[in-house]
Amino acid sequence: MINGIDHYNLRSDEKMIETLKDFYISIVGLKLGDRPPFKSKGYWLYAKEKDVLHLSTSKDNIKNLINVNSTLDHVSFSASNKKNVMETLEKNNIFFKERYIPEINIEQLFFKDPAGN
């Protein structure tokens, strides 16, 4: 029985992985945490006590293909202070879109990371 999503992984070359690590820590607010000693270089980023984002270098440190057809549209994080998130995005010149879904009383912010995810 599936209980939910455990984590997601972004894979790219070492330079982009470093850029993504910095973005998800400084902008999104995830924390760097423990990661098993895999052969590939990478990081596990945590929300509270849970690893939610894995970053890993691709085989032979080659940047993954861009513009590959995919059905993945977005990944969603929950946050406790929308105003602070918006201020951080604005301060760092990160374009975002707001959306409110009144039927379920949800406010959303959509933005892209440096790799375009």
Label each PLM-derived region with a short phrase.
Residues 1-21, 73-75:
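N-terminal beta-strand motif that seeds the catalytic metal site of vicinal oxygen chelate
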Residues 29-36, 94-99:
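Short secondary-structure junctions
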Residues 20-27, 89, 116:
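Conserved active-site tyrosine of GNAT-family acetyltransferases
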Residues 11, 46, 76-80:
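Short hydrophobic/aromatic beta-strand micro-patches
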Residues 1-3, 87-117:
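Vicinal oxygen chelate
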Residues 31-66:
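Conserved short beta-strand elements that form part of the metal-binding/catalytic scaffold
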Residues 37-42, 71, 103-107:
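Short acidic/glycine-enriched loop/turn segments that link adjacent beta-strands
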Residues 68-89:
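Mid-chain, well-packed structural core segment of small domains
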